[in-house]
Amino acid sequence: MESRKAVFIYSNELARYHYPPEHPFNVDRARRVREILNSRGLLSGNGRSEVAPTPAERIVLKKFHSARYLHALQTASKGRWDAEALDMGIGTGDCPVFAGMYEYSVLAAGGTLVAANLILSGDADVA
């Protein structure tokens, strides 16, 4: 039976950002999962590897989001948002504002793109 190529997308850079404590999403969870995988030898050898995400380029982000939304997200990341941002869901309970949220989002989106490209290229079966 052929072993599957598995890639874990992670960077310590992701741990620099934090959702508000009352939000259920915790960016530290990925670090803890990585520690468990690493302690069990599941991140290297036998078709397994770890790859760091790269920030998604704005031109790629604009294929999925309007320039207006990206600007609102960037502005909110600096602690400023308004009614228009709220209308787009920025600053709500589901998408709370936090310092560096734009940078985190760009890196997380980039990680998704890295994973998709690894799978499409055949360099990974699972990412």
What are these regions (language model features)?
Residues M1-A127:
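HDAC/HDAC-like amidohydrolase catalytic core signature
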